[in-house]
Amino acid sequence: MAESKRIKTALVSVYHKDGLDEIITKLHAEGVEFLSTGGTRQFIESLGYPCKAVEDLTTYPSILGGRVKTLHPKVFGGILCRRDLEGDLQQIAQYEIPEIDLVIVDLYPFEDTVASGADAQAIIEKIDIGGISLIRAAAKNFNDVVIVASKAQYKPFADILNENGAVTTLAERRWFAKEAFAVSSHYDSAIFGYFDGEEGSAFRCAVEDQKTLRYGENPHQRGYFYGDLNKVFDQIHGKVISYNNLLDINAAIDLIDEFSETTFAILKHNNACGLASRETVLEAWKAALAGDPVSAFGGVLVTNAPIDRATAEEINGLFFEVIIAPDYDVDALQILTQKKNRIILVRKATEMPRKQFRSLLNGVLVQDKDTRIETREDLKQVSEKAPSEAEIDDMLFANKIVKNSKSNAIVLAKGKQLVASGVGQTSRVDALKQAIEKAKSFGFDLNGAVMASDAFFPFPDCVEIADKEGIKAVIQPGGSVKDELTFQYCNEHGVAMVVTGVRHFKH
């Protein structure tokens, strides 16, 4: 089997023509003959190069409104013929089938059509049949055939042409085959995802959209992102986003999406260390920073309101890795972009996936995303004392934060400001003690604050500790076999408590 192969005949059938002209020009200069259909053939001929119609080869026209163009033995025989098998060569000679050494395909834009909001019929018509078949056939026979399966591979193929002419090595053909199967598997999983709809049982890894990160969680680990970040945000300034940046950005977006009021949050290691809701974005920033000005250093900032100049001036004095906002004033950007490595993101109004995936052991865990947001109607008063209106507002506020904190988690809030939190603790009591200690270290008065827990209290101990600090309103899921002991403590000590019936573990 010859390692190097010269391309003599190319079949070209693409949806997107941009970037193709350089390749066609170079192939023509190398003496390569072209086969094509419809618009692609017209494109090649418009460049001034001859191109044989597939219909002339097969003696069949394009039928069924273009649904069947290349699906014919004279096409696929020329692609799948094994050049080192005499029997294959004899058969294609018998049936006058030309050898095809190169296949260039760019599939119908199925995902773009779905995203455009097109109707079902238009979406179905963008399910490519001939193109995907050509990709699989050419990739299967990579020993003899080169497959360029998407416009993303135009450049690497053009580089080979510029360096070696119309000659490819086995290693190069195998690489293109690998990329081709990545394209076909992603395409098929996208179609499955469309038909699967809200069931969300499709696990898709967008190999063709692989992004190499600086490193993984630590410098000695390699890291990659599979997917399309451009659908979530635009990066308008700063260094390359890292693995850890993405974890924090994801946590920040999940958290800020809980709030409709103007809100600012500061996160470190996926947990909020500062958060507040206020009338203006500047006021929200100041209150969020006051929650923990020490941990804010090197954090990720996120808000659901546009950043103005005054807010940018305040923010600029702090070192932080990333800022996410729906928009920025021109003056604000002039200030924020003074630090060249600072990552500035513009959040897009994109609906986030409804499923979450986590790889472990020898497989993948899949679950529905926790999109539940409790409201006043979900609160059940279990204490004799009723919470005030302000306490209810603060309890719902704190509940949103604790839901997005690592378990075990306790959140203390007051006046729609995160006062302190204890997160990621093996003991709920330790989480509360951590929060109390932090609040005191920054001078907060806990009298009138509320407490939120991500899961039930197995004993009254947390409520007792909080009560002694002046915390007289508590929100929790409830559900412990010893709930009544906790409720009894509340009644004996004038603590208002509501339960939601919904646990919010986060691991």
Question: Model regions: which residues?
Answer:
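C-terminal binding/interaction regions
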Residues: F320-A325, V330-R342, E464-H507
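Glycine- and Gly-Pro-enriched alpha-helical subdomains that act as flexible
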Residues: C273-P293, V411, Q417-V463
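Active-site/ligand-binding-proximal alpha/beta "capping" segment
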Residues: R83-I132, R136-A138, K380, E384-E389
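N-terminal glycine-/serine-/threonine-rich phosphate-binding loop
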Residues: M1-L57
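Glycine-rich nucleotide/cofactor/substrate-binding loop typically near the N-terminus or early
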Residues: G39-F110
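Cysteine/selenocysteine-centered motifs that mediate thiol-based redox chemistry or coordinate metal-sulfur cofactors
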Residues: L301-V302, D308-G317, F442-D483
